[in-house]
Amino acid sequence: MANLYSKKVRKSIRKFIRSGLNFDLLHEKHGRRLIINNIFVKLPPKYYNFAKGLDLNNILAFDSEIIQLNDLKKLIMRLPLLPDCFTDVISCHKKYLLSDAAIVNKLINSNMVSLSDIRNIIDNRIKTPVEIALLNSSLVIPGTPFSLDEVKYIFENTSAENVKELYKRIETPIHSVLYMEEKFSISPVHSSLYQVTDVDKIIYLIKKYPDDDIIDYVNGIVKSKKDFIESIITIIKDRLPDISPCLNKWISTQLPPDKLRDEFGIYFYALFEWIDIPLYIDKYLFLNITEDETKFICRYIDIYKKKSELFVNAFRWHLYYCNSMYPQKVFPVITYKQDSKEKYVVKESFKYLDNKQTMKVLLNDFKYNYAIGKYILDSSSSNEVKMDALNMLQKQVVCLENAKCFDLGNLYSVLIKFQYHPVDYVMYSDKLLDYMSKNSTFDNNDIGLLTLASFLFSTAKKGIIDINFLNTNSLWSPLMYLIDDSCKVDFTRFMMATKNIKADNINYLKNKDENINNNFEHIDNIDIYKLLDYSRIKLYGINFIKKVILANVIFEYIFTLIIIRYQKTSYNLRSFLEMLLYRCLKGFGISPKLYKNVYVNEMNICCELENLINNYVVPFKTYGILMKLLITIFNNLNGISKHSFRIRVRKSKTLL
């Protein structure tokens, strides 16, 4: 057994508890240690520069008035869209942020500005109405005039939906609206449509765009004409079994319910479901219902059930005895109750730390969640309960037994102590491109795969990785659980990705006459904000996420190469595994002697890989071996090599 946190971190947590969870009363060295280990929520001003230096996202832990404008601008520019947690700090600094055109783009895209802000932006000539419409049409000031050329320009650079949203807010001539409809098939949902009094033209437009609310913009004189009402009824009937809510709403204001029911028959109850008229079973003879009516009822069975369960039950019996079965879900599905533990997530669980028993369960389930300190401090519990929870947290231990490799505990304890220092960072890209130009692809044989492995691991040591090494969704290994709000390792994403493991999906194993895409990038240059939701970045911090991504990519490299080799042949797999482990350790500058210390049962691994490929069974033994290898690598990178896991390949004896 070993402690989850180092001795110094445990001491800092105890000091924090004695201070009553007050960072102001804590010695600065202990406060910094807690910040490094992600145990904080709100911070006093004295830690600003230190916290910002670790991770720019940490500035959100300070009061809005403390946050420096330049730091806020840098953070805003890194994010594709601003989440709700930025609302207060942006409100505090909005006056100064609105003077920067690039920042204004982000604020408009994220709906973080009001109409009064938009007026100031236009008055100060930061943005024009057209530029605002290109970013977010819903923020254009109502009544703003737009010419035909401006509307066309917006359509060409955005989409038809954006133009339709723009129509709700702008003033533009009717000829512009009709031109855009004729040339680009953009629905004329604009107030100027009331100028059109040609009934045939209006009917044509409604038929062409039945799902849009064109009828709301039609001239009242046109609507009052009898032939117009009859045409709308015809359009509604012709569209069945599809429903046009806008047309249905309007026609229900023109005709009384009884007349509508007589006009539409059994369709009435679904077309006008908001009209409170009972559905009596004796009003309709099921034997007289047509095939189209039956399909319509099946499609909207839920609406009919709300009107009358008796009608629906009788309808089901009618279908049953007539031996009529339809693809729609008409008959209730029989479900069987399964006994399973209710899945819960850390954010919801830590809202209430009611008692010590609950606390023990939560801390045990989520002890490998790097944001657990934040969740404890951010809970609604009293300070006494939070202090008890932190006291339990600093006493958490990790089991060093082999079997416990599966719960990621060992790897987690190694990663939180790991401080990455990139080697030969300067000009790495030029050297990499030069190497890749000479070695554009690798052969799909043992020599080619092992040569590729040497290249991958030696570049990974420098922090240079390819997160799209396999052409599938990136970051798919089970290690990503370490930045997931779950108490169990989820293998779903991993198993989905393994279906795509084949030589054709490895960029560097393609035919020699094909060009390859060089996706290698230093881990510091990877745009984490595009890969992950910002809530996770804010919780776990950029630095820890990069550590997990590095470990994840190493796992993906090794596992993918093993599968590729096994798919080609299982002959002499033991020798290949030995050399692959050797190349991996050597690439990270770790003593090659350690590759003889990995215990593997070749027969078990072959059976696992066969089950994975054919039956999609999780390969737990292979997963465990790779976990041991990762722990060995990061222990050595941490400067700890005394107690590395022993991994030796054996053909017959099972030791894992």
From Swiss-Prot:
Keyword flag Transmembrane helix: yes
Keyword set includes Transmembrane helix: yes
InterPro entries registered for this protein in UniProt: Poxvirus_E2/O1, Poxvirus_O1
Main location: membrane
Entries under Pfam families matching the protein: Pox_E2-like
Transmembrane segments: 544-564
Keywords: Membrane, Transmembrane, Transmembrane helix
Domain of life of the native organism: Viruses
Subcellular location: Membrane
One term under GO cellular component: membrane
Recorded topology in the membrane: Single-pass membrane protein
Family (UniProt): Belongs to the chordopoxvirinae O1 family.
Protein name in UniProt: Protein O1 homolog
Source species of the chain: Fowlpox virus (strain NVSL)
